[in-house]
Amino acid sequence: DEGGTQYTPRL
């Protein structure tokens, strides 16, 4: 992903 901030936020 794009750092996990655009499509699926990595929390």
UniProtKB/Swiss-Prot annotation:
Instruction: Give the UniProt keywords, A-Z.
Output: Amidation, Neuropeptide, Secreted
User: Which top-rank group of organisms is this from?
Assistant: Eukaryota
Positions of post-translational Leucine amide modification: 11
Q: Where in the cell is it found?
A: Secreted
Any single Gene Ontology cellular-component annotation: extracellular region
Protein transport as a keyword of this entry, yes or no, is no
GO biological process terms held by the UniProt record: neuropeptide signaling pathway
Q: Which family does the entry's similarity section mention? A: Belongs to the pyrokinin family.
Relate the protein's function as given in its record: Mediates visceral muscle contractile activity (myotropic activity).
Q: What is this protein called?
A: Pyrokinin-1
Q: What organism does the record attribute this protein to?
A: Carausius morosus (Indian stick insect)
Give the organism's phylogenetic lineage: Eukaryota, Metazoa, Ecdysozoa, Arthropoda, Hexapoda
